[in-house]
């Protein structure tokens, strides 16, 4: 049955193999045939399309996209293509990159702009900028906000605007109320401040106009000018005025506020949910740019607090500050004097619609960071900042910080403070003082949360009757126009102050409200009244009333300053009563506004409530811990330092470690929005665009190394871009130029600077200058954009305006809707009259300076903001267009195009159908003549199916003719295959054509509506006069419409080109299909079949020469003849032509076609089929190997690298570069350096960089490619980094000179996961992976069956026959062999080069070897195995690049049978004959046994050690196993490490499976620590026998006693490292026989998981004795009968521990001292982990004797001769290996172990494993060959190997299975004395003969003396047992007994309680034990 199955499988495999060959032939013929030219061009085009498509995933990946923008990568790619031999490939790649890439980008940008402008709306047109900046949309007043927002289809791409429900409108208070307003709610994803518009109505009665508009009905175009004016959406002329709108009723206002307060609403932001934008106020008008001399050195500062009166929690002051930032104008502060431009006078400041205070302190921003953090520290930890009981000195905080952190001599020492305040109001300084006082108090109150909050709330004593108390500042104005500026300040009335307010009858309010005498009666002025005089009195009285512990010290220092610098210092002590001390009033005025404004940042997060500043939680600690970081966040307002330091640094740092930058997820700046969940690896470069100025609208993002998304302290310079329509204020050109110069890396020239100023800071347009001042201000506020942004319509934009007198006529004509032809004629006429358009009218005017703009904007595109913007531009539109492009053909074809196309295709199909009607079935003909649009695909599929049916019939009929007809069958299949491919190509092109036509229809619809609107606009403009403004909406007059029209025109032209191309291809596809059908016709003619059969019989096609494949049997000569051309052409062509003259042309064509195909087949066998031919025709492969190789054929086919994988490898970020990473579970994972090196090595091998040769003069190539090697070769130098020394003069060299290892030896103990690591790397590398199993070479049962020697040897005789055949063939074809050798093959060149091969000598050698093989069949077996091994090596060479893995490589030299294979491996892998693209990874757990020849320089020259998992790695592994199964772990912090200590990866899996079973049985999805403890207990205890419930309370009390002692004595040291849970389950065999009695106890799995440095040995002694004492106290009658360690094995353990204690007391030294550190054989000394070993003997005498012994040994070796083998060659067998290290064997280093241990049942399971490399003594009578097991049981071990453990400074005590015996038998020997169990005579049994497993390492002459040394050393290491020690033992035992006795008697109730719980629950966990002791 098996043989039949194998035969059937072999037949199937052969058929599959042949079919694969035929398929390859078909594809080759498709490529080479001349009539498939168009088909080949189609595939070429399709390949190019795939290349372009491969770029699309790069756009979705930020790191790859940013790296792709580096021109160095493009230079590398182009250089690689230039160096290629195929010129066409280089041209194709360049064409794809240049042409199609540009087309893709342009089309994507245009589609984005068209789609996101919301063009196709009902009779309206909205314009959107490239960036999602909210514009002024015009709409009627009575439209609801939701309808306005809903009308736009790009809300998800623009800045999200929260909208109202239907029927509700926007109210004034919804924007002014921070509680109600959504813009101030930090829970929302986006805050947007609406664009305000000035009105002459009172400020309290206005509402925010023109925030979001609604589409205008077309009826508005026909309405009156009054209607248009009523909605304030047009600008008629210079005398136009804004009309006021009606107030919204109060009830509706309240509804809107309630709606806006709803925190559940959220709208997606443009930058996804990770980002948030904050758009702040507007910018001053043109007057700020005219005269900038008066206040050139001053800064603009403004703030307006706002608050709802109903709120009682001061934490909402955050919203107040947020609202202030939205409504104020924050001008950047520069450290360079003269760089800032501020408004000249107050009227200019009025234009900003905000209150502006001027205060100049150029260095205040540098001081803020230190002051803020010092201020934070003074509040949270005052004892660390100031001495106890001391007051604040008169020196500023900044001075103290300078002394502490900043070196002396800083330029800040010469700081001179200047204060210039220019206001007409006399009391404005008092207003400033009062505001700052209130603001600072608010900040203090918010920062200290509940402690100061209840106190400082009561400072604001106001009139309680005024619920919404308002006060404002009225500023006088200079110049024309009056703009009323008011701000609201709402403070609550503290209800708790009512009593205090009534008591103080003459109470003077701190703030006195008085009406301003200014022109605006609605403005209030506030000033300090007399209340300021007694402020300190009231404050102290109030605080004394409240018994506060607050101290607020307001001091001033007077040194080094001309004017006093006021500071605000406050300190809160954790303990003690402090007094309010207010020395002066003016110190409330802080030094600068930024300090007080940003003090709140230090206390923003909840983490700052705590006393400690952790690095992961506190921003404060990060600043001072990383002060030297090159991205220094301490300088918050140096807006260029951050970017300049980044770009001035080594840029390769970002390539090597791209994750150095990340974001802050915790909100820190007052107006940041959300806490985004951002991991460290989400982004590449961080956020370098911190503050983006859109006029004065700012959103702030931060850069840093921590995990938070935002940090308000870090601000950098804005990088503006014309593409993103970011406007730089007029007062910023110098700073902007400086920033861009830093970013670009090269300074800008003067011409570029001038161009930059002209580009970014253009003056206002002519229309703005001509308007009056008030109109100009209103215009600026209305539009909120400068005209240089191409969004403000100016006179240049409307040169066709008519005079005012033609206004009425234009209105009349406007009422008539002009027809489209009339509009077109008018536009053309006007275009002729105009001649040429102004340069500003061009939509692409910036293209003229594209070079300068590209250089300027390129850094911005490399930032994350730029990437997000480009990502949204080029990728988001495709998702919108996808439904449109996939619609049906009938809905998109225009009438004309569809008719013409249908007619042409129908004619083609009809002609094709008529030509095929004679040869094919009627069903095929009828199907092809059906309709094109409905059944084209079905017709072609039916034709293919009918043709296949015909092939089946033809195959059946021709089966009896002969094998030659198979060629005709394959040819027919080839034609049908061509037909199917053409059908597929046609269908694909037709689908693409449908999509393009659909797209054209969509564009046509847009262009039609847009063209109509545009022509309407043009015609209307021609009708109106020059001085008359037409009644057309503003948005219809923008020049962006022209840009849209040009874009549509471009897209239409592109669509036409695509349609033309596809139509041409479709027509050619039809013609090729027709040709293919014609070629099928001759196969149906019987006469042609007969003629062809006759021709094939006379002239058969040539067959491959079998001589080639017979030579494969030779090991050396297999590869020589792969490239032999075996094509034998017909020699007599004239005779052939004469004999073929009577044949028909069809038969000749078929014969020619068949011969051509056969020639191509044999020719290409040497190219990509030599492996196939070799495997198929070779006799060396048995049947199993043959099918195995056929199955793995896919790995043998080598492919060339194309542009896609190279580009992917260059731009792909290897996340393995970070040695320290965070996994999903939050556990820190430290990867071993050896594994990191191996990962990088495989990664470089995968990226084809192994042998990449380049010229060192190319800096880009050098840096990019050597960046990989810099990370993997860092261990070669002592400092940990590799310094490359490149050859000079630009000579090319190979990267192999930089020592990437070609062979790696991975060592590690069993269970460390060596094989898992290698297989994982091989899987991720996507390279062929070959496993050379050495174990198969050691197998005694080979794959072929050997027969007995006296019988015949058929297999051997067969080999001899092949050898004889080889000898005969070689003698005949000597010259032929030498001439046909391929020079590229790696063969023995010396033999071939001589040319005089002695074939007679070769024959004699073969004959001699044959005779020897007959005599020694084992040799034949070994040779056969070596040949198999060599075949694998040859296969690796063929399919290289690949990875070879050789597990257990130490077995190559252990036996004679592997010596030949080892030699072959060394020879093949030598430097001379090995290939360069093979990575060999060998692994072993016994590195001492590896052959030294394998680890030479050119072979396995790199050694990597794999250690056991660290606890974080185990946790990650466990968490992964649990999460993948749907369970959630909930483990204690330290308990997991104690539970799984010593477990390997293989052990964790069954442990987790058991835990899951327990969780399922308990019906819980959360796996906690106790569940894993139960699983571990079940796994370890129930491994040997089934559990049984034990009713014996004696054993239970034994366990309880031990647990109580551990909890009482060791709880402080063990923490969570407690014992395994108590269980009442016992071993079944404990009560089975009854003879043993209570011989087995519960396994004490984790007895003492702690450090010896924390717990003394005495605690261990107490723990060992606890069980016995507790049992005896509870069950033995009478206290006089209590005996310690009676008949228990505890006595032995106790005894050994007591010996250690005595030894330590004698030496008076620490127990273990400093442990030695492992010397890793790898080169990662810098990253090694301390690995404690067995300590040396502690007795000084023993150490001294050991040294003398060593000297004597060396002396004896020097005298003696004839050593057979060195001692290091001794080896031992492994019997068993422990999972947990047993510490007492380490501590009892040299103590002899008694034989009675084994007799008592003590399992010596650690012992045999530890004897590797050690001497093994055995009796004389034992024989190794007889019984190895008996031999292993007969010897006595004398030494132990090093037993390392897996956690530093901790060890685990794991007494193995059953440890404590409760039998009644007497213990042999005295407990209190230690007798000598070994006499000298016992050791002398080995004196006569000493044997080891293999060979003796002692010389015959030196045995006697060395045995004496061994015996003496055993004596030295034995402890002395005298009477003094016995007395000490007895004393310690009695003291221990008394202590434990008193302990248990005092806790008898606890013992009983534990017993009851244990009987009831059957489990007692450590945490439950903790409850008992509480």
From Swiss-Prot:
It holds the Pfam family AAA. The keyword ATP-binding applies. It is found in: Plastid, Chloroplast stroma. InterPro entries: AAA+_ATPase (IPR003593), ATPase_AAA_core (IPR003959), P-loop_NTPase (IPR027417), Uncharacterised_Ycf2 (IPR008543), Ycf2_N (IPR056777). Residues 219-246 are annotated as: Disordered. Keywords: ATP-binding, Chloroplast, Nucleotide-binding, Plastid. The keyword ATP-binding applies. One of its GO terms (cellular component) is chloroplast stroma. ATP binds at residues 1308-1315. Its main location: plastid. GO terms for molecular function: ATP binding; ATP hydrolysis activity. Probable ATPase of unknown function. Its presence in a non-photosynthetic plant (Epifagus virginiana) and experiments in tobacco indicate that it has an essential function which is probably not related to photosynthesis. Belongs to the Ycf2 family. This is Protein Ycf2. It comes from Jasminum nudiflorum (Winter jasmine). The gene is ycf2-A.
